[in-house]
Amino acid sequence: MNSLSTIAFSLGLLLVTATAFPTPGPLGEDFKDDTTSDRLLLTSPDKTEALIKYILGKISAMRKEMCEKYDKCENSKEALAENNLNLPKMAEKDGCFQSGFNQETCLMRITTGLLEYQIYLDYLQNEYEGDKGSIEAVQISIKALAQILRQKVKNPDEVTTPDPTTNASLMNNLQSQNDDWMRNTKIILILRSLENFLQFSLRAVRIK
């Protein structure tokens, strides 16, 4: 799938999800203009899984590209561990692990985490030197996934959106020490962290 068709697919997906669900409250600026109509089958577990797998596939391709182009592979693990970018992660209290699984708590954490990742994807959009269409496709699809999962939460108004001031501070932190090595290290760390977060999310939506 080329860049243009990838973006077109993702834009279509976001349009479908935005018009398919009633929005009880704001979910960030991107969802304020949602319209109300009948729910689509996109909320079914298999459709949600398919979307997560699609995003994971795009991330895997970008990681492979970084590995081949900049030699940023598993040998970067130690260096990456030293870079604290405050990336969203799953913890025991989030209720997403099989032991102590709590669907409501977990869905809330996944949805919030996906919204928190948007600022990191903004950074990738600016700094990633590979296929820009892949980054845009991931960002659009993450927004669509957050919208889908929000409809599964019993109290969607309680889903918190990132504070603009916090996001601005995060972006400043990301853009600091932005020489080629650090930039590429940050990119691979963000991709790896998002991949792990989505893999936890995939397992969580499968738990009945």
Swiss-Prot record:
Signal peptide residue numbers: 1-20
GO cellular component: extracellular space; interleukin-6 receptor complex
Keyword annotations: Acute phase, Cytokine, Disulfide bond, Glycoprotein, Growth factor, Phosphoprotein, Secreted, Signal
A Pfam family reported for this protein in Swiss-Prot or TrEMBL: IL6
InterPro entries reported for this sequence: 4_helix_cytokine-like_core, IL-6-like, IL-6/GCSF/MGF, IL6/GCSF/MGF_CS
List of residues that carry Phosphoserine: S76
Gene Ontology MF, one: cytokine activity
Alphabetical GO biological process terms: acute-phase response; glucose homeostasis; hepatocyte proliferation; interleukin-6-mediated signaling pathway; liver regeneration; positive regulation of multicellular organismal process; positive regulation of receptor signaling pathway via JAK-STAT; positive regulation of receptor signaling pathway via STAT
Classification via Gene3D superfamilies: 1.20.1250.10
Locations listed in the record: Secreted
Keyword hit for Hydrolase: no
Disulfide bonds: C67-C73, C96-C106
Glycosylation sites: N167
Record-stated family: Belongs to the IL-6 superfamily.
Quaternary data: Component of a hexamer of two molecules each of IL6, IL6R and IL6ST; first binds to IL6R to associate with the signaling subunit IL6ST. Interacts with IL6R (via the N-terminal ectodomain); this interaction may be affected by IL6R-binding with SORL1, hence decreasing IL6 cis signaling. Interacts with SORL1 (via the N-terminal ectodomain); this interaction leads to IL6 internalization and lysosomal degradation. May form a trimeric complex with the soluble SORL1 ectodomain and soluble IL6R receptor; this interaction might stabilize circulating IL6, hence promoting IL6 trans signaling.
Chain's role: Cytokine with a wide variety of biological functions in immunity, tissue regeneration, and metabolism. Binds to IL6R, then the complex associates to the signaling subunit IL6ST/gp130 to trigger the intracellular IL6-signaling pathway. The interaction with the membrane-bound IL6R and IL6ST stimulates 'classic signaling', whereas the binding of IL6 and soluble IL6R to IL6ST stimulates 'trans-signaling'. Alternatively, 'cluster signaling' occurs when membrane-bound IL6:IL6R complexes on transmitter cells activate IL6ST receptors on neighboring receiver cells.
The protein's name: Interleukin-6
Gene name of the record: IL6
